[in-house]
Each structure stands twice: as structure tokens, then as C-alpha cells.
């Protein structure tokens, strides 16, 4: 039996009809106020008047059974017929109770075996129809209702005029419903077809031992079918017979929880109709009326909520899911995440998940409490004797000692391994200021002290790892410098270690001496940093030129690469100058003027230092990936300029300048040129310059230790600072020439071009004052 059936409340006179592609007979069972049953038979009759053809495609025949006319009906057959009509007979696997109107299948064929059983009441009751009404017979009655139509054709006359006159007379009568003909008067008693049905005596809102079918209908009109009564039936909607059941918006059916944990049974007016869907695959079969809903909280819980008498003492009715029958109070919670639903939209869900219904604040505060702590979801609702699992699935059949393993179990592990910053091998310690392995430590020491001239055969981008670290020494050495390896870091470490040992030795004392006297250390370690120590911290790192050594070397390529590298070095020099103690106290215009006058001093002196430390003053190490050797120096316009720059590195090599001396001399070169009219913060400038002159003297004393040679070395170092003016003057002249000569097509970065543009007029006018230590 493939049909769609729905039950309506007695308080509403909404007929169920089938609006499909094919019209057939439709039967509606109305619950009257007298407890009887009313049968409506819809038959197509287009032979009526043309004025009523549009809205009278289906005429309704209202049949009211008197109590005496059906006294000989057998009760067992009546019970079976009613149970079949209600759609709750579970023997038929194809029966569907959906949210659409009540109707028979489109085939509409009622076999003789089932028709005689279901329409046995009609055979005896329709015999009295010829006495009270007359309905025209349509000549083209559908074959889909052959049995029922044949029974009606024997009793109904074929006079269309009688129907028209009867309808006109009944339009103004009070006992009619639209165009329906009411055969029985109001004072006639009707046959109660529900009196012998075995329904549960318990009903929501009533006592347990009182049957709802014996209630006074005049006092409580909704008590007859209270478990199925709703104020607004959402299932009585028009739709095609072939349409699937869509999720419906139902009233809020969330279980109400008392303070003691018991469920509050909902009132009959608030319990919705069941939505039972039995597929061919038998995914789910609900043996008791229930609804499927979605909670308001984050996770979506699908659960069958049972009404009224089905929940007594926390005992749940049985549900069969995938062939697994549950009984004895078992309850299954299906915890589905909303994200999972969105990801699996192409799959057919077992449950029709219904969107959450907004609940008014008054009902929520009255039933659930006023605070967020009273929120209760089905996934966390525990009944006595039930074990709840972490995934929301609860069943008493599982052992209580079974527990899920911890999700994030951290095993006791040691410290993470340390890797070399150069070749990614396992590091053996901190060497030359960088965490490296022993192999890279030895390589860097030999590369610096051996004064090797490494050249990359590729593009200075070779991969340096544990296996290929010996393939390209140039790229390996470049990566060592990039990581920050420095030979001076080893000396600094030894000094710090010596200071710590000295402090520890002074602070140690015997117990007997400590009891008698308090020892004050003779020399305390200096807590405030010195200017030289700050200069070591702010020293800029080595930059790369990005020069492609695989292409042929030309003057244009090398000069353009040097200019691009110089632009980045100027930016680094600006940041370095602002970090010098006292420099930012100068006027902003003075800061800009000093940087514009000294940018070439800073780059040339730093180039000489790198060449002195890495190439023994034989090569010019502009960058780890751009080293000017003798072959590149022989290019046009290159030798004269390289000769001036090699002079600086050779002097540093000859004097064996220390790193602290280099830092002080570099700072003094920043303060070596001023305008002729002076600076706006001239006094502060002189004070800062004198401070670093004294720091240079301290560095000399620290290096020599013998006061007899300190003045001689100070003279040599300051003489080198004076000679830097001649070197920078020659370099600036060539730089200005290449900048102004557009035929050479030498590229200049934007910032460097702006500095040169502002500096050319000042040098041309001679508005520069050189601050020299010695007279020429």
C-alpha cells in the first residue's frame, strides 16, 4: 500500500486533497464533536455549471454514519480498517506518512481483496444515500477507483439539475461546509469508530487511568487525538505526489527538564505530528510517533522525541536503526557536526535534519532558566543507568571500564636537536658566535686565517647541506658570513669567561672569614655598557650583491651591481647612524648633512676592512658574491678606482687594526666632514666627536698595554683617517662623472641618486670643511 496520509486536528476544517498530475478519489476522515467519523469522497464532475467549473473539479460527498445504520459492523474488521487508514500499520513496508496531503497512490487501483476489507463499511452505509441526496454521475470515471466508483454508481441518480438546485439551497444553510452536502442532521448520533481501538490510556495533560476517548468533547475538543493535535499542521501543504519529503519547520520540541532531572511532558497543543519515513533500504523505522529535530546549539543532534504516554519513568520505546533493535530504555544520540553536513551534501542523510527554530526569550527563561549555565543539549543529557561516550553515543550495552585514549598524549622526550646554521648538520656547539657543526667551524677558521680566494663556479646560489657542503667553498664561506660567524666572537667569549672567573674568585671566601668580616670586591664588573660595546651590537651585517658570475664580466655590469649594492648599504648606514649613542640628539638637518657627506667614507672604509679580514688586502670583497680580483680590475675604468680602495685595506693590514679600533675609526669618519658655516648643533657635535676620539684611545690602550707606544699608534690611526679624505675625493669624482655621463648607462638606485644630486652642488661650491687630525 503506497500512500501518503496525514491526520488533522478536529479544531480545523482543512480538507486534505491531492493536487497531483492525475486526479483520483480522495477520502478525508473528519473528527466531529460527537466522537463519530465523517467520510468525504471526492469525485471529478466537470458536468456542473460553467460558472463553477474552475473551483469544483472535485466535489465533496459528506457521509455521516448514523449509529443505527451500522450496527451490524464487525468490530475487528473496523479496527483493522481504521488502523490501515491511519498509516500506522507497520506491516506494509512501503507505507509513507509524509508532510503532504492525504491521498492514494497515483495508480489508485484498489484490489478486490483489500477493497472489500477497507470499504466494507461503505457497502452498507452508502445504500441510504439515494434517500437523502443526489449526485450526478460523471460519464468518465477514472479506472483507478473502479471498485469504489462501481459501488457509488448503483446508488446515485444521474440528474444534474438536482445537484444544482440542492447546492443553491445549501449555500445559505449553517450546517454546510462550502459546497459539501451534510446528509445527517445535528441531532442524529454518529457511530464512534474509535471506541474499540486499543490506544494507550495515558495522554499528555491527563491522568494515567483516564482514557482520552471518553472525555467531554464540549469541554476539551482537542482531547480525542491529543498526541497528534497541533494548532498549525505543517504537513497539510500542497505538493506533487512525486516530490520528496523536504525538511519542515516544526514547533520547538526540545525536552523540558525540571530541577530534579525529570522530563516535563509537553501539552497536547504543542506536540507536533509524527514524521515517519520508511525507505526501501529500511534505514529507519519508528515504531512510535515521534519527530526528528535539530538542536539550537553548535553540534546538530538528531533524536526521536516521543510524546505523552511513550515516556513513562524514563523508559524509551524501541527504535530499529540499520537492523539493530533497541529496547529496554536504550537511547541513541546521533551527533553530527554542521561542517560535516555541509561537506556531505551529495550523500543522502538518514534523518531529515530540520533547521533550528528560534525560541522566544520568555519561553526559554521559563523552561530552561535565565542563565547560560542551564543550557542542556541532548548530547549531554544523561539518564540513570546509562553510560555516555565521548562521541555523543550512549548505550547501556557497553562496559563502563572502557575509556577512550587521551587525544594529546605527550611522551617524555628530551630537548630538540640542534642543527648547524650553515649545513643543517647536527651542531656541536656555538662556534665563532654561531651554532654550527665542527666541520663548518674548522672550515671558517681556515678560510679566514688561510686567506683563500674562493670563487663560485655557478651563480653564487649553490645548495649547502651535509652532503654538498664541500662542493662549493665560496658559497659555504658566504653562508658562514651570512649566519654571522666572526673570529672576534671567540675572543669576546674568552674575555667574558675570564671576567666571570675573576668575579667568582673574589666572591668566594672561607666560612671562618665570612663570619668575621665582610669582603668588598676590589673591582666590580661594569654594569653600564661602553660606547664600543654598543657599536659592536649595532654593526650592520654583510649584504649580498646578487651578481651573476656565470655571465661575462663587463665594466657596465660590475659598476651597476656595485651601485645597487651601494644603495642598500646607504640604507643600512642610516639605520646604523641613528643607533649610535648621542647621534639622534643632534638636529635633524645636521643628521642628514652628516650622512650626505660621509656615505662614501663609510662604504670605502668598510670595504677595506672586509678585504683586510677576508682577502689579506689583495682583493676587494664588496660582498661575498662579488669579489673584485686582478682579472676584473683590468677592465676599463676599473683599475684606478680599485687602486684607491686597495690602499685602505693595505693600510689596515699594515697597522693590524683591531675590531674595536675599526669601530671607533668608522664612527669618527661619520663625523669627519661638516659644512663651512657649521652645524645647528655644533656644540653637541663636538662633544660626541670628542667622546669617540677618547674611545679610540681606550681601544689602543687595551690592545697595546704599553703606554710608551700608545701615542705612536694613535698618530698612525689618525693619520689613516686623514688620508681617507683623499681616497673618498677621488671616488666621489668618478661617481659624479658616471652619474652625469648618460652615455655610460650606469644604473643608480633611487636613494643613492637623490644623495648624489644634493651633494654635487655642495662639492662644486666648496662648501665642505674637512675635520683633520694633522696638518699637511
UniProtKB/Swiss-Prot annotation:
NR C4-type zinc-finger residues: 420-440, 456-480
UniProt entry keywords in alphabetical sequence: Acetylation, Chromatin regulator, Chromosome, Cytoplasm, Cytoskeleton, DNA-binding, Isopeptide bond, Lipid-binding, Metal-binding, Methylation, Mitochondrion, Nucleus, Phosphoprotein, Receptor, Steroid-binding, Transcription, Transcription regulation, Ubl conjugation, Zinc, Zinc-finger
Cross-link type Glycyl lysine isopeptide (Lys-Gly) (interchain with G-Cter in SUMO), residue numbers: 277, 293, 702
Post-translational modification as stated in the protein's UniProt record: Acetylation by CLOCK reduces its binding to glucocorticoid response elements and its transcriptional activity. Increased proteasome-mediated degradation in response to glucocorticoids.
GO biological process annotation, one example: cellular response to steroid hormone stimulus
Glycyl lysine isopeptide (Lys-Gly) (interchain with G-Cter in ubiquitin) cross-link, renumbered residues: 418
Predominant cellular place of this UniProt entry's protein: cytoplasm
Domain of life the protein comes from: Eukaryota
Residues where Phosphothreonine is found: 8
Keyword field contains tRNA processing: no
Modified residues (Omega-N-methylarginine): 23
Gene3D superfamilies: Erythroid Transcription Factor GATA-1, subunit A (3.30.50.10), Retinoid X Receptor (1.10.565.10)
Span list, region Hinge: 486-522
InterPro entries reported in the protein's UniProt record: Glcrtcd_rcpt, NHR-like_dom_sf, Nucl_hrmn_rcpt_lig-bd, Nuclear_hormone_rcpt_NR3, Nuclear_hrmn_rcpt, Znf_hrmn_rcpt, Znf_NHR/GATA
Localization (cell): Cytoplasm; Nucleus; Mitochondrion; Cytoplasm, Cytoskeleton, Spindle
SMART domains in the record: HOLI (SM00430), ZnF_C4 (SM00399)
Region (Interaction with CLOCK): 484-776
UniProt similarity note: Belongs to the nuclear hormone receptor family. NR3 subfamily.
Assembly with partners or alone: Heteromultimeric cytoplasmic complex with HSP90AA1, HSPA1A/HSPA1B, and FKBP5 or another immunophilin such as PPID, STIP1, or the immunophilin homolog PPP5C. Upon ligand binding FKBP5 dissociates from the complex and FKBP4 takes its place, thereby linking the complex to dynein and mediating transport to the nucleus, where the complex dissociates. Probably forms a complex composed of chaperones HSP90 and HSP70, co-chaperones CDC37, PPP5C, TSC1 and client protein TSC2, CDK4, AKT, RAF1 and NR3C1; this complex does not contain co-chaperones STIP1/HOP and PTGES3/p23. Directly interacts with UNC45A.
Cited function: Receptor for glucocorticoids (GC). Has a dual mode of action: as a transcription factor that binds to glucocorticoid response elements (GRE), both for nuclear and mitochondrial DNA, and as a modulator of other transcription factors. Affects inflammatory responses, cellular proliferation and differentiation in target tissues. Involved in chromatin remodeling. Plays a role in rapid mRNA degradation by binding to the 5' UTR of target mRNAs and interacting with PNRC2 in a ligand-dependent manner which recruits the RNA helicase UPF1 and the mRNA-decapping enzyme DCP1A, leading to RNA decay.
Name of the protein in its database record: Glucocorticoid receptor
Gene name, Swiss-Prot/TrEMBL: NR3C1
